[in-house]
């Protein structure tokens, strides 16, 4: 979704620009739904004051939900592999938070920003340093486990307190 927010910003939050630059590339039968979807996102971005920067509340809520689950998983002795993946990624998370000057930023937001940053580098065909690749590998592994547990939690298949 962060990419969608950026795509909307790149098109100046203007439905006409999105139509010309994005929507016309899709099959005709999908365009009406896309117009409505992007229109709703533009409205939300305007109402929430994130037209220039920041993230929609729905995206922030996902981070909050993931953080809640992360805290439950990491405080439970039932998930040692999850804790190990987290502690393997933690030095990279701390380093990234220090580098970006956002020491108070939630850890998971830092992780997603790192992944998104690498995605943007790859899209621009820019090199990724060995250190960054190593950090992203650890962070990706950690987030992959969290995503798996999140999916199980949403399906009510995750037993945290048994």
Question: What do these predicted ranges mean?
Answer:
Residues 47-71, 154-162:
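Charged low-complexity stretches with an acidic bias
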Residues 7-10, 28, 43-51, 68-76, ...:
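Amphipathic alpha-helical interaction surfaces
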Residues 20-21, 60, 87, 133:
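Short, charged, amphipathic alpha-helical segments
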Residues 94-162:
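Glycine-rich, aromatic-bearing surface loops/beta-hairpins
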Residues 38-41, 63-66, 139:
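Short amphipathic alpha-helical coiled-coil/interface segments
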Residues 56-115:
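A charged, amphipathic interaction segment
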Residues 15-19, 38-45, 86-97, 112-119:
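Extended amphipathic alpha-helical scaffold segments
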Residues 1-53:
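N-terminal interaction modules that seed assembly of large macromolecular complexes
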């Amino acid at each position: 979704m962060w990419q969608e927010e950026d795509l909307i910003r790149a098109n100046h939050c203007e439905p006409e620009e999105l139509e010309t630059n994005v929507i016309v590339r899709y099959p005709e039968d999908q365009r009406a739904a896309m117009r409505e979807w992007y229109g709703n996102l533009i409205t939300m971005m305007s109402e929430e004051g994130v037209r220039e920067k920041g993230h929609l509340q729905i995206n922030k809520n996902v981070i909050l939900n993931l953080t809640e689950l992360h805290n439950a998983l990491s405080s439970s002795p039932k998930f040692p592999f999850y804790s190990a993946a987290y502690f393997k990624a933690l030095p990279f998370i701390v380093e990234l938070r220090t580098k970006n000057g956002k020491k108070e930023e939630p850890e998971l937001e830092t992780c997603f920003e790192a992944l998104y940053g690498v995605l943007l580098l790859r899209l621009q065909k820019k090199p990724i340093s060995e250190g960054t690749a190593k950090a992203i590998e650890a962070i990706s592994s950690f987030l992959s486990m969290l995503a798996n547990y999140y999916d199980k939690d949403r399906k009510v298949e995750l037993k945290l307190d048994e």
